[in-house]
Amino acid sequence: MPVLSEDSGLHETLALLTSQLRPDSNHKEEMGFLRDVFSEKSLSYLMKIHEKLRYYERQSPTPVLHSAVALAEDVMEELQAASVHSDERELLQLLSTPHLRAVLMVHDTVAQKNFDPVLPPLPDNIDEDFDEESVKIVRLVKNKEPLGATIRRDEHSGAVVVARIMRGGAADRSGLVHVGDELREVNGIAVLHKRPDEISQILAQSQGSITLKIIPATQEEDRLKESKVFMRALFHYNPREDRAIPCQEAGLPFQRRQVLEVVSQDDPTWWQAKRVGDTNLRAGLIPSKGFQERRLSYRRAAGTLPSPQSLRKPPYDQPCDKETCDCEGYLKGHYVAGLRRSFRLGCRERLGGSQEGKMSSGAESPELLTYEEVARYQHQPGERPRLVVLIGSLGARLHELKQKVVAENPQHFGVAVPHTTRPRKSHEKEGVEYHFVSKQAFEADLHHNKFLEHGEYKENLYGTSLEAIQAVMAKNKVCLVDVEPEALKQLRTSEFKPYIIFVKPAIQEKRKTPPMSPACEDTAAPFDEQQQEMAASAAFIDRHYGHLVDAVLVKEDLQGAYSQLKVVLEKLSKDTHWVPVSWVR
């Protein structure tokens, strides 16, 4: 067996150990692991570095002098004053090079052990009580980013104190600045008698590093853990337009339906949050859920928010004479059960009773739209497919999209078979085109809230039941339904996990046409009126129900809308989506 000498290094020891490893049937994995570790080049390099450092410690070298730079300058003066020969001229040139001067400066720094920064001395005219307080000097490197802290003047003591630490900012990452700390100096400038806006300007103008002289708070607050709560915003927010925010520059703007990561709820009025997917690591201020609800309640009481009556059905939801509810569901030679033109587009009158009250209950007590807590969700194999809900404005023609999707893949997609009190025709089959029931049975189911929505056409009742939707989903098919937006609240449950798609027609700008004869004026007017109605209906749905929507499709033509819808449906079972947190708990 080889013997190590006293001068053998660690890397030589590792090499010897590797060669001495012998196969062992009982410890194959352990032996293989050791062989891999000992053979790693990076470990060998580390051992060599370790040996060099140990050798340096044993030698314990001391510098010959502590001022090599000064010596070099003296030599250069002598060379410049004396008669210059070729060797002297070369030496003078070498001593003048920036690289050699830098090496000499590093030598002096190491020799003098001048590693720590020199702190500025305390001023002579210091307050008497200042000596008794613990002063902390904090130096932060913040580049061009904000400090990530807000300040205010204490009403009682008049001191400038740290009011808030923004999560993810330079101050938060340092862990050295806390809420309640008193700020005395910024880069050597006393701030005791300066206004907060002047101090903020000094902080903003400081580039690279910034030195703060602070007095720690008497009761230093513990650093709280991030809450990691995700919220979907149900409203637009611009801090520049918010007079109540304590610091507009610290505010976080966001759009409706944007997902926010709330990292701090310490303040009951102003939360700290980040936009999911944003590269900016610093959090910003947003109004808390409770504070925003109080503001909306106040505005509603003051009459600056829409009244409950304004949420009732607008003029666009009127009968469409061009479509009826008895059209067959044929497309490309295939018959698809349950497909028919929507009875909602026929002459519809809501029946009275409990269902009417249920459908209008949301209009009587409209909720205050602030935030909705959400979580990531991905469809798992063996799990029932999510319900796909289509809502559309005037001119969306949702039934065409449903027909095309189901006809293309009837094994994967399906539609709910509606109920009707209309007599069955000779070519119709029970449970295929419709579920044919008596008026008494229909009204009984209506009384027990079994219908998602219903309508009346030519004295016959039509409706879509929740059981019909459940029957399609039980077959492991994706059920497509098109409903009025009022029905969304009833469908947004963990049972259905609906994915809501808003389909709206492309609104063309008013076309410029040459002057027309009086005979043509009547034919041009309906075009503009129809465009206005379509735009108004889309705006109404977006205003009152847009916060519930997961995807928006703009329909210019059937094929284009179908292509968009197909992409959305393909991603539905593959991608991760944000859903209400109650759906996944």
Curated annotation (Swiss-Prot):
Role: Participates in cell spreading through the phosphoinositide-3-kinase (PI3K) pathway by connecting CADM1 to DLG1 and the regulatory subunit of phosphoinositide-3-kinase (PI3K). Stabilizes HTR2C at the plasma membrane and prevents its desensitization. May participates in the maintenance of adherens junctions.
Domain SH3 intervals: 226-296
Entry's localization field: Cell membrane; Apical cell membrane; Cell junction, Adherens junction
Coiled-coil ranges from the UniProt annotation: none
Subunit structure: Interacts with HTR2C; this interaction stabilizes the receptor at the plasma membrane and prevents the desensitization of the HTR2C receptor-mediated calcium response. Interacts with HTR2A. Interacts with HTR4. Interacts (via PDZ domain) with CADM1 (via C-terminus)Interacts (via PDZ domain) with CADM1; this interaction connects CADM1 with DLG1. Interacts (via Guanylate kinase-like domain) with PALS1.
One annotated GO molecular function: PDZ domain binding
Residues modified as Phosphoserine: 307
Predominant cellular place of this UniProt entry's protein: membrane
Keyword Cell membrane attributed: yes
Residue spans crossing the bilayer: none
Keywords attached to this entry: Cell junction, Cell membrane, Membrane, Phosphoprotein, Repeat, SH3 domain
Record's GO cellular component terms: adherens junction; apical plasma membrane; cell-cell junction; plasma membrane
Domain Guanylate kinase-like: residue ranges: 385-570
CDD domains for this protein: GMPK, PDZ_MPP3-MPP4-MPP7-like, SH3_MPP3
Tissue expression summary: Expressed in retina (at protein level) at the subapical region (SAR) adjacent to adherens junctions at the OLM, and at the OPL.
Domain PDZ: 137-212
Name this polypeptide is given: MAGUK p55 subfamily member 3
InterPro entries xref list: GK/Ca_channel_bsu, Guanylate_kin-like_dom, Guanylate_kinase_CS, L27_C, L27_dom, L27_dom_sf, MAGUK, MPP3_SH3
Domain of life, per lineage: Eukaryota
Domain annotation L27: ranges: 6-60, 61-118
Recorded family membership: Belongs to the MAGUK family.
